[in-house]
C-alpha cells in the first residue's frame, strides 16, 4: 500500500465533515452571505476538483497566449504558492518587465511571466485585490484565474475544470480521505471540462473519466488537452534547441512526476536515472551538486528538468549541459472559439 493510500485510510472518517463544510461554504456564497466580487471584464477560471497536478499551468499559458494573439490584454492572477512575497498585491510581470524573482513570486507564476511577454502576472492571497489592481491600475481586459475553481470570492464568466486522463477523480473520496477537494456536486458550477494528458492517437477514444462526465453532466462541453513532443531550452545557451544527447539524467519537483518521466521515455531518451522531488521544491547548491554527481555516475551526457524547475536553478552552474523540456500543448476543436466567444459576449 502506498503512503498516500495509508494517509487516506486514516483521514477517511473526516471526509464527510470536510465535504459538508465545503458544501456549506458554497451555499453561503450562492446566497450572498459571503461576498463575491464582480469585475467589469471577463473572468476565466482554470481549476480542478482533484488534488495534485492536472496541467493547469499549460492550459493557463495556452489561454493567455490565445487572448494576446487576438489583441486582448490578459492578466493571470495566482495565489503564488511557495512564493515569499508577502504583499497583498505582488506584480510578477507588468507585461513588459519581470519584477520579481522565482523565489519571491513562486515557481509557476514566474515561469508564466518569463514565457509570456506582454501578459500581466500578479500574485496575492486575496485574489480579488489582485484582480481589482489588474483592471484598475494596469488596464487588464481579461482575467485568468489560475487554480480558481474553489476560489469563490471572485465571480467568473467561464469555469473550466481539468481532470488528468489517467487518474480521473482518484478514489472518489473527499479530502482527507481521498483526492477530491470538494464532493462531486461541485461540478454543477463547471462550464466546461478539459481532460489533460491524452495522446493524439486517443482522440476518438473516450476514457472512463470522459464517459463519467458525459453521463452526469451531458450539457457541459468536453475538450481534450494533448501534450505532444516539443522543444528543449538550453540553460547555458539561453535558447531553444531541438536535438539533445539521448543518454540523460532527469529530475523534477512537480505534482505529477510520472507524466514527465513517461514523456521523456516516449521521446526515446535513455534515462540513466530519475529523481522526483516534492512539488514546489526549493533547490540549493548542494542539492544540484548531488544531482550532477548522480548523473555523472550513471554516464549521463545531459540533464533534463522542467521549465518550472529550471527557473529556480538557473543561477547554479552544472558540469553537464542542463535543459528544460517544453512540450507543446494543443486543445481539441472549438476550445478557442469558446474562450473568444466568452470574451466577445461579455456585457451583452
Curated annotation (Swiss-Prot):
InterPro entries (alphabetical): LpxK (IPR003758), P-loop_NTPase (IPR027417)
Keyword Transferase listed: yes
Domain of life: Bacteria
Cross-referenced SUPFAM superfamilies: P-loop containing nucleoside triphosphate hydrolases
Catalytic activity, reaction form: a lipid A disaccharide + ATP = a lipid IVA + ADP + H(+)
Gene Ontology biological process terms, A to Z: lipid A biosynthetic process; lipopolysaccharide core region biosynthetic process
EC number, as in UniProt: 2.7.1.130
GO CC annotations, alphabetized: plasma membrane
Keywords: ATP-binding, Kinase, Lipid A biosynthesis, Lipid biosynthesis, Lipid metabolism, Nucleotide-binding, Transferase
Major enzyme class: transferase
Chain residues that bind ATP: 50-57
Cysteines paired by S-S bonds: none
Pathway in which this enzyme or protein is active: Glycolipid biosynthesis; lipid IV(A) biosynthesis; lipid IV(A) from (3R)-3-hydroxytetradecanoyl-[acyl-carrier-protein] and UDP-N-acetyl-alpha-D-glucosamine: step 6/6
Gene Ontology MF annotations: ATP binding; tetraacyldisaccharide 4'-kinase activity
NCBIfam families reported in the protein's UniProt record: lpxK (TIGR00682)
Record family assignment: Belongs to the LpxK family.
Function text: Transfers the gamma-phosphate of ATP to the 4'-position of a tetraacyldisaccharide 1-phosphate intermediate (termed DS-1-P) to form tetraacyldisaccharide 1,4'-bis-phosphate (lipid IVA).
Protein name, per record: Tetraacyldisaccharide 4'-kinase
Amino acid at each position: 500500500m502506498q503512503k498516500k493510500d495509508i494517509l487516506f485510510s486514516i483521514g477517511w472518517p473526516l471526509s464527510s465533515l470536510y465535504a459538508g463544510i465545503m458544501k456549506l461554504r458554497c451555499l453561503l456564497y450562492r446566497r450572498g452571505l459571503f461576498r463575491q466580487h464582480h469585475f467589469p471584464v471577463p473572468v476565466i477560471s482554470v481549476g480542478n476538483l482533484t488534488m495534485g497536478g492536472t496541467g493547469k499551468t499549460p492550459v493557463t499559458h495556452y489561454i493567455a497566449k490565445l487572448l494576446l494573439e487576438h489583441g486582448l490584454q490578459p492578466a493571470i492572477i495566482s495565489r503564488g504558492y511557495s512564493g515569499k512575497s508577502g504583499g497583498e498585491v505582488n506584480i510578477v510581470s507588468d507585461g513588459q518587465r519581470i519584477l520579481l524573482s522565482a523565489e519571491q513570486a513562486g515557481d509557476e507564476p514566474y515561469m508564466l511571466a518569463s514565457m509570456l511577454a506582454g501578459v500581466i502576472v500578479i500574485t496575492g492571497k486575496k485574489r480579488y485585490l489582485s484582480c481589482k489592481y489588474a483592471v484598475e491600475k494596469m488596464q487588464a481586459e481579461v482575467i485568468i484565474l489560475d487554480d480558481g475553481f474553489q476560489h469563490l470570492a471572485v465571480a467568473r464568466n467561464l469555469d473550466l475544470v481539468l481532470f488528468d486522463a489517467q487518474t480521473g477523480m482518484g478514489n472518489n473520496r473527499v479530502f482527507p480521505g481521498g483526492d477530491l477537494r470538494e464532493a462531486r456536486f461541485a461540478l454543477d458550477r463547471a462550464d466546461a471540462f478539459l481532460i489533460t494528458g491524452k495522446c493524439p492517437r486517443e482522440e476518438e477514444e473516450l476514457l472512463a473519466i470522459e464517459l463519467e462526465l458525459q453521463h452526469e453532466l451531458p450539457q457541459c462541453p468536453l475538450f481534450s488537452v494533448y501534450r505532444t513532443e516539443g522543444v528543449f531550452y538550453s540553460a547555458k545557451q539561453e535558447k531553444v534547441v531541438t536535438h539533445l544527447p539521448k543518454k540523460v539524467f532527469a529530475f523534477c519537483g512537480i505534482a505529477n512526476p510520472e507524466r514527465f518521466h513517461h514523456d521523456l521515455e516516449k521521446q526515446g531518451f535513455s534515462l540513466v536515472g530519475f529523481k522526483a522531488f516534492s512539488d514546489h521544491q526549493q533547490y540549493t547548491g548542494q542539492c544540484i551538486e548531488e544531482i550532477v554527481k548522480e548523473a555523472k555516475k550513471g554516464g549521463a551526457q545531459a540533464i533534463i528538468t522542467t521549465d518550472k524547475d529550471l527557473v529556480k536553478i538557473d543561477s547554479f552552474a552544472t558540469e553537464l549541459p542542463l535543459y528544460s523540456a517544453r512540450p507543446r500543448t494543443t486543445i481539441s476543436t472549438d476550445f478557442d472559439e469558446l474562450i473568444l466567444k466568452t470574451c466577445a459576449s461579455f456585457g451583452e
